[in-house]
Amino acid sequence: MILIGNQEFYKGVGKIQYEGKNSDNPLAFKYYNPDKIVAGKTMKEHFRFAVAYWHTFCGQGGDPFGPGTQQFPWDQASDPVQRAKDKADAAFEFITKMGFDFFCFHDIDLVDEAPSLAETEKRLEQITEYVAHKQKASGVKLLWGTANCFSNPIYMNGASTNPDFNVVARAGAQI
């Protein structure tokens, strides 16, 4: 089942199917056939693919030579929680069109970090409820979720190993 949110982000793209190595369809699996039995298990059982939020929906193409230039349609709303909901809609549409069963994320991949930890927690509560609904509707499961205790400059000297105990305490609260 393909899960589409308030808008379709990947218009014209249906569920990605296995078509074999001779297919010229760029949106088809050439070698991965989820139903093929290999060593007593289906390929789907052997290859438990997970879509990583950070790499798939958050990266904007930045590198040491300059900022990112990729702009995504789910990253347009001015309200950070709405932007996070749009990203979740795009994510679950993508995951279900790919036919994958799992996703993974860092906390601030789901929703932008706020100026304060308390406000970040409020945002996380809102998006967590929304994502849980998406999981239930799609059957997509969480492979892992964790705290990003490295991107914020406050963690420049580490999180749990930071010499400033205020930073250690913040990391503990974030986790």
Which residues does each PLM region occupy?
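N-terminal pre-domain/capping segments
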Residues: M1-Q174
